[in-house]
Amino acid sequence: GGMGLVAACDLALAGPASTFALTEVRLGLAAAMISVPLAARITSRDLSRALLTGERFDAEHARRIGLLTEAVEDLEAAVGDLVDAFRPCSPQGLAENKALLAAPILADLDARGEELAGVTARLFTTAEVAEGMTAFLERRPPSWATPDA
């Protein structure tokens, strides 16, 4: 999903209209593969809440929990400033630092990737996922959802 892509980025900016959510749990799924880069970015308590509730949150909250580098008002200007910050940087230095940052995530994916892919594959064969996907497509709550109190 989108949050996995954001978590895989070295730097991530978002504007005030941006929203984020890990909605897999509402479909009967787990955010298995993307949990690896997410765990490298988001505090464990905040990741637990996002994974277990599927709640939607804004860019400022995403910045506070570590998913974003910055939540900005003017995204285009902020990206321009970031590009300018790279101008004096050595390509070799950037490449080596990127490798250092990516190494733990890649090692975790190497160690657990097959297992996590298996979790996703298994879940896609279940009745709960079929119900979750059908409910989503029909724009209705899934059968397991309890009404608000």
Regions found by a protein language model. Name each.
Residues 54-61:
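Acidic, divalent-metal-coordinating active-site segment for phosphoryl/phosphodiester hydrolysis
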Residues 1-51, 64-65, 78-82:
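CoA-thioester-processing core
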Residues 132-149:
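Short, basic/aromatic-enriched C-terminal tail that caps enzymatic domains
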Residues 35, 44-47, 91-98, 116-117, ...:
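A general structural signal for well-ordered alpha-helical segments in protein cores
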Residues 13-18, 68-114, 122, 127, ...:
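C-terminal long alpha-helix characteristic of the crotonase
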Residues 6, 62, 97, 136:
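Terminal peptide-recognition signature
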Residues 54, 127-131, 139:
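Short acidic-aromatic low-complexity motifs
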Residues 50-52, 122-123:
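Short alpha-helical segment immediately N-terminal to, or the first helix within
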